[in-house]
Curated annotation (Swiss-Prot):
The beta-hairpin motif is involved in DNA binding. It comes from Colwellia psychrerythraea (strain 34H / ATCC BAA-681) (Vibrio psychroerythus). Forms a heterotetramer with UvrA during the search for lesions. Interacts with UvrC in an incision complex. GO terms for molecular function: ATP binding; ATP hydrolysis activity; DNA binding; excinuclease ABC activity. Residues 634-669 form the UVR domain. It is found in: Cytoplasm. This is UvrABC system protein B. Disulfide bonds: none annotated. ATP binds at G38, V39, T40, G41, S42, G43, K44, T45. Its main location: cytoplasm. GO terms for biological process: nucleotide-excision repair; SOS response. Belongs to the UvrB family. InterPro entries: Helicase/UvrB_N, Helicase_ATP-bd, Helicase_C-like, P-loop_NTPase, UVR_dom, UVR_dom_sf, UvrB, UvrB_inter. The gene is uvrB.
C-alpha cells in the first residue's frame, strides 16, 4: 500500500516545525477540532502537507471557491506527485436551477452547461477514495451537495478479469446500465466501440487512457490499457473495474423499488391537491411525475433524477443526503482552508436551496420528497465530519469557540518577509494616484492588484487603465472556472500587469509577483471592507520583498484601524524574530504551473479571453505586427476580413473576434500613416 510522501526541496522553518508538532499531537490525542492561524505567506499549505504525510490518512481539503481549490490542487500535486491528488468542485460552467415565481406565474426550467473535464475529475476523485488510501481530495463547498449513494455506485461497477467466461452481449448490456453509449466513430469519454471480438471502453473517470477487452469465443483473453489517440498499448492488466458514467447510476432493482414508492407518494399528493381544489397543480404534478417514471423504468434514469434521491438511496424522510463525505473513510482527515469564509458558506447553502424548492412543491412541479434533494444542513455536516483542522489567517468566532486553546499560531515566515507596509490616502484622487503607482512598478516587472466594490467598477477601472496604456484585466464571478485559473496564470507570467477584482482577490491567492495591493473605497464599511477582508486583501502583497498596501479612504474606520493594528503587531513580531535569528528577508519565487492542464505558457498565439473585452495585447515583442505601408495595410485588412468571415461561418466566434481586433488595430495604424 502506497504511503503519502512529500517530494519537496524545502524543510520546515520559522514557526512551521512548532505548528506541525502541535497539530500532530492534537490529532493523535483525539482532538476533534484544531485551528492553524497562519499569516499570508507563512507556508500554511506546506505545514498541512507535512501533517498529512505524518498521519498518512485519506484527506479532504475544503476551499471556499473554485479558484482557491485549483491553486491548492496545483500545490498538493507538486508536494505529492506519486499519490492520488484529486479535484472535486461543481462541474457546471453555467447552472440555472428549476424555479417557480408565483407573482408572475413563471416557471424556469433547469438549464445547465457541464464542464466535461471537471466531471471527469469528480469521477476520478470518488474512484480514488474507493480504491486507495493515499488520497488527497481538494474540494469546494460542492462536497456538501447530494451525490449518488456510494452503496448503489459500488453495486453498479463492472468487474472484468482475464479468464472470465462472459458473453459479449452481457458486457454491452452492463455498459448500457452504466450509462455508457456505443459510438464506433467518435471514441470519447463514457463511450465504447465494438470491433469483432474486441471491445474498447473509454472510462468516464479517465482523462487519457482507454481499456481494450479482447475475447476468444466467450472467454476474456486479454485486457489492456491503451492511448485512444495513437492506439499504442501502455500495459496489460489481469483485472479491471469499469465505473458508472455518473454518480447517480442506480441498480435496476433499486429503481423498480423507488418507482413503486414514487407512485404511492404521487397518489397521496394528488389527493391532497384535489382536496384543496388545486386542480391545475394536481394535473401538472401527475403529468410530470408519470413522464419521469416512464423514463426511469425504460432507461434507468431521467432528467432531474436527483429529485427522487430519497427513494433511490433508501433514506427516511428528512434524512441527510449522501455526499462526498460518505465516500471518505471513517479515519479520514478534514482540512477547511480559509475557514472564516468556508464555514459560513456551508451553513448558508441549505436555506437558500430550501426556499426555492418549497415553491416547486407547493405549485405542483415536484413531489414533497424533492425537498430531500438538498445540501447538508450545518448540524449534519458537523455530525459527519472527521477530525478537522481549520486553516485561516483571520479565524472567525466559530473556529475560536470550537477550538478554545487548541490553536497553532504561524506568524513568522520561513522567508523572513514582514507583513506589507500600509498607507492611507484620500479617495478623491484614488484612480489617478493608483495609475501613478502602477507606472512606478512596471519598470521593475512587478504586478499590482486593485480591489473595487462592484463588478461595474472593476470593469470600468480596467477600461480606464487600458485607455492609459496599462495592460489590465478583471476577475469576478462572471468569469468561468477554468478561465479564472488561466487569468491568474497569465497575470503571474506577465502577460498583463494589473488585475482588478472585488471579492476573489483575497483568501489564499498565491502571487509572489504582486508588490502593491490597492484597496479602493476602503472606508466604506461592509463585508468587503471588514477587518478580516482588509487583512486578507493586504496579505496578497506579503510574498513580495517590496510589498505595500494602499488603503484609499477619507477617514479611518473601525475595521481599517483593527486591520492596521493587527498588521503592525505581526510586523513587530516578525522583525524581532529576524533580529534574534539573524535572518535577512528574501522574496518568494514560485514556479508557475498549469494546474488544470488547460493551457500552454509559451502560446503566443493564444486567444484573448472573454474577460478581456475589447482588449488585444501580446507580451512577446517579437510577435507584434511590424509597421506596414498603406497599401500593405489595405491588403492585410482584406485578408483578415476573409478570415474573420470564415471563422464566423464556422461558429468560431473567439477566433473571429481576434481577427476583428487585429483589423481595428490596423485601421488605427492606417489613420496614423
Amino acid at each position: 500500500m502506497k504511503k503519502l510522501t512529500i517530494c519537496s526541496e524545502y524543510t520546515p522553518s520559522g514557526d512551521q516545525p512548532t505548528a506541525i508538532k502541535q497539530l500532530l499531537e492534537g490529532i493523535e490525542s483525539g482532538l476533534a477540532h484544531q485551528t492553524l492561524l497562519g499569516v499570508t505567506g507563512s507556508g500554511k499549505t506546506y505545514t498541512i502537507a507535512n501533517v498529512i504525510e505524518k498521519l498518512n490518512r485519506p484527506t479532504m481539503m475544503l476551499a471556499p471557491n473554485k479558484t482557491l481549490a485549483a491553486q491548492l490542487y496545483g500545490e498538493m500535486k507538486e508536494f505529492f506527485p506519486d499519490n492520488a491528488v484529486e479535484y472535486f468542485v461543481s462541474y457546471y460552467d453555467y447552472y440555472q436551477p428549476e424555479a417557480y415565481v408565483p407573482t408572475t406565474d413563471t416557471f424556469i426550467e433547469k438549464d445547465a452547461s457541464v464542464n466535461e473535464h471537471i466531471e471527469q475529475m469528480r469521477l476520478s476523485a470518488t474512484k480514488a477514495l474507493l480504491e486507495r488510501r493515499d488520497v488527497i481530495i481538494i474540494a469546494s463547498v460542492s462536497a456538501i451537495y447530494g451525490l449518488g449513494d456510494p452503496d448503489s455506485y459500488l453495486k453498479m461497477m463492472l468487474h472484468i478479469s482475464r479468464g472470465d467466461i462472459i458473453n459479449q452481449r452481457d458486457i454491452l448490456r452492463r455498459l448500457a446500465e452504466l450509462q455508457y453509449t456505443r459510438n464506433d466513430v467518435a471514441f470519447a469519454r463514457a463511450t465504447y466501440r465494438v470491433r469483432g471480438d474486441v471491445i474498447d471502453i473509454f472510462p468516464a473517470e479517465s482523462d487519457r487512457l482507454a481499456l481494450r477487452v479482447e475475447l476468444f469465443d466467450e472467454e476474456i483473453e486479454r485486457i489492456s490499457q491503451f492511448d485512444p489517440l495513437t492506439g499504442q498499448v501502455e500495459r496489460t492488466l489481469d483485472r479491471v473495474t469499469v465505473y458508472p458514467k455518473t454518480h447517480y447510476a442506480t441498480p435496476k432493482e433499486k429503481i423498480i423499488a423507488a418507482v413503486d414508492k414514487i407512485k404511492i407518494e404521487l397518489k397521496h399528493r394528488s389527493q391532497q391537491l384535489k382536496d384543496n381544489n388545486k386542480l391545475v397543480e394536481e394535473q401538472r404534478l401527475t403529468q410530470r411525475t408519470q413522464f419521469d417514471i416512464e423514463m426511469m423504468t425504460e432507461l434507468g434514469y431521467c432528467s432531474g433524477i436527483e429529485n427522487y434521491s430519497r427513494y433511490l438511496s433508501g433514506r427516511e424522510e428528512g434524512g441527510a443526503p449522501p455526499t462526498l463525505f460518505d465516500y471518505l473513510p471513517d479515519d479520514g482527515l478534514l482540512i477547511i482552508d480559509e475557514s472564516h469564509v468556508t464555514v459560513p458558506q456551508i451553513g448558508a447553502m441549505y436555506k437558500g436551496d430550501r426556499s426555492r424548492k418549497e415553491n416547486l412543491v407547493e405549485y405542483g412541479f415536484r413531489l414533497p420528497s424533492a425537498l430531500d434533494n438538498r445540501p447538508m444542513k450545518f448540524e449534519e455536516f458537523e455530525a459527519i465530519s472527521p477530525q478537522t483542522i481549520y486553516v485561516s489567517a483571520t479565524p472567525s468566532k466559530f473556529e475560536l469557540e470550537k477550538c478554545g486553546s487548541d490553536i497553532a499560531e504561524q506568524v513568522v515566515r520561513p522567508t523572513g518577509l514582514l507583513d506589507p507596509e500600509i498607507e492611507v490616502r484620500p479617495v478623491e484622487t484614488q484612480v489617478d494616484d493608483l495609475l501613478s503607482e502602477i507606472n512606478k512598478r512596471l519598470p521593475l516587472d512587478e504586478r499590482v492588484l486593485a480591489t473595487t466594490l462592484t463588478k461595474r467598477m472593476a470593469e470600468d477601472l480596467t477600461d480606464y487603465l487600458y485607455d492609459h496604456g496599462i495592460k489590465a484585466r478583471y476577475l469576478h464571478s462572471d468569469v468561468d472556472t477554468v478561465e479564472r485559473v488561466e487569468i491568474i496564470r497569465d497575470f503571474r507570467l506577465g502577460k498583463f500587469d494589473v488585475l482588478v477584482g472585488i471579492n476573489l482577490l483575497r483568501e489564499g491567492l498565491d502571487m509572489p509577483e504582486v508588490s502593491l495591493v490597492a484597496i479602493l473605497d476602503a472606508d466604506k464599511e461592509g463585508f468587503l471592507r471588514s477587518d478580516r477582508s482588509l487583512i486578507q486583501t493586504i496579505g496578497r502583497a506579503a510574498r513580495n520583498l517590496n510589498g505595500r498596501a494602499i488603503l484609499y479612504g477619507d477617514r479611518i474606520t473601525g475595521s481599517m484601524r483593527r486591520a492596521i493594528d493587527e498588521t503592525e503587531r505581526r510586523r513587530v513580531k516578525q522583525h524581532q524574530y529576524n533580529l534574534d535569528n539573524n535572518i535577512t528577508p528574501q522574496g518568494v519565487v514560485r514556479r508557475i504551473t498549469d494546474v488544470m492542464g488547460v493551457g500552454s505558457y509559451s502560446d503566443a498565439k493564444s486567444l484573448d479571453k472573454v474577460a478581456e473585452a475589447n482588449t488585444n495585447y501580446h507580451i512577446n515583442q517579437q510577435a507584434e505586427e511590424p509597421l506596414l505601408t498603406t497599401s500593405q495595410i489595405d491588403t492585410k485588412i482584406v485578408e483578415l476580413e476573409k478570415l474573420m468571415q470564415g471563422h464566423a461561418q464556422n461558429l468560431e466566434f473567439e477566433q473571429a473576434a481576434a481577427m476583428r481586433d487585429k483589423i481595428a488595430k490596423l485601421r488605427i495604424q492606417q489613420l496614423s500613416t
